[in-house]
């Protein structure tokens, strides 16, 4: 089973990584093509394009300017440890074992507007470029056009390497839309996490994001390779709902959010 998750806007390059192992991103030629274009934008243009404050626009203009295709532990960090935010709070990668990292390297992928697709131990230089950004480029009107079917093809390769055709989608709609389903040679399993609020079960963004991270961790630590095993997920009060689920769309409910 191959799990895909979204990246995060929040990054941590201050905390030392808990593992010295690293790999290099596989699609840096594409990343560099985007960087060349992004460097042509002023901070004001970045602010308008990405809907950022002047401060954040300036920060990311500087990031694009200092980006280099030569990745080292001195200027980059393993992607799974660099990303922060709700999903990564739930995943809590800093407490994974070396064996867990080995498993994750084969069975987990992070979608990215700049890097396309990242493995957990791929070094990543800091950036901000959401997949939904309408950055016109030589390949089309936005990043979905830029990546085209590439991400699907790379996922097909990863599915082949890890031994089955099961793709667990724990990414947001914005990011999974970069996966062209017509080009994907795998069975996609979608998951929803719903919390009880005002008498109804609803998807609450903050809780759902964290739950995606917790399920990603569950898959890694339990070495899950069968959709039936996913139904055993019961972290922080979630439980599988057979009534609301379908074979390729699993629903988990929670009656009381964990403190």
From Swiss-Prot:
GO biological process terms held by the UniProt record: response to hydroperoxide
Lineage: superkingdom: Bacteria
Pfam families: H2O2_YaaD
Residue stretches spanning the membrane: none
Cellular-component GO terms for this entry: cytosol
InterPro entries tied to this protein: YaaA (IPR005583)
Family named by the database record: Belongs to the UPF0246 family.
Name of the protein this chain belongs to: UPF0246 protein PputW619_0896
């Amino acid at each position: 089973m191959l799990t895909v998750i979204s990246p995060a806007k929040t990054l941590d390059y201050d905390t030392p990584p808990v593992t010295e192992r690293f790999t290099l991103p596989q699609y840096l030629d594409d990343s560099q093509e985007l960087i060349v274009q992004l460097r042509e934008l002023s901070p004001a243009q970045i602010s308008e394009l990405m809907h950022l404050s002047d401060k954040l626009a300036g920060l990311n203009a500087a990031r694009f300017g200092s980006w280099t295709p030569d990745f080292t532990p001195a200027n980059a960090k393993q992607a799974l440890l660099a990303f922060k935010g709700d999903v990564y709070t739930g995943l809590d990668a800093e407490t994974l074992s070396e064996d867990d990292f080995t498993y994750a390297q084969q069975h987990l992928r992070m979608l990215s507007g700049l890097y396309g697709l990242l493995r957990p131990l791929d070094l990543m230089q800091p950036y901000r470029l959401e997949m939904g950004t309408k950055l016109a480029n030589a390949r089309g009107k936005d990043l979905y056009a830029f990546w085209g079917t590439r991400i699907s093809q790379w996922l097909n390769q990863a599915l082949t390497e890890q031994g089955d055709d099961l793709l667990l989608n724990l990414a947001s709609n914005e990011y999974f839309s970069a996966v062209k389903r017509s080009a994907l040679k795998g069975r996609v399993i979608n998951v929803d996490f719903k919390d009880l609020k005002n008498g109804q079960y609803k998807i609450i963004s903050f809780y759902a994001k964290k739950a995606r991270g917790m399920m990603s961790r569950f898959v890694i630590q339990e070495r899950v390779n069968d959709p039936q095993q996913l139904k055993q997920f019961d972290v922080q009060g979630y439980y599988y709902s057979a009534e609301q689920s379908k074979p390729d769309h699993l629903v988990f409910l929670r009656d009381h959010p964990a403190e």
